[in-house]
Amino acid sequence: MDNLYSQINSEININVLKLCRLISKNFNNGPEPKELYKLWIDALPKEVTEDFVIEESKPETNLDD
């Protein structure tokens, strides 16, 4: 059960990172979106952000899935 919770939590964190990245890319009118993205990355466990960096290096997929 702990493993399932961990997987779900990791997916949620990755999806929030994707959302913050989209905000940062699309609404780059000030420091707020970049700060939101940076604060979220800093708050996450390192293994989650490492997984996200690996996923980001893959080709972009449709985020509407």
UniProtKB/Swiss-Prot annotation:
Domain of life: Viruses
The protein's name: Uncharacterized protein 437L
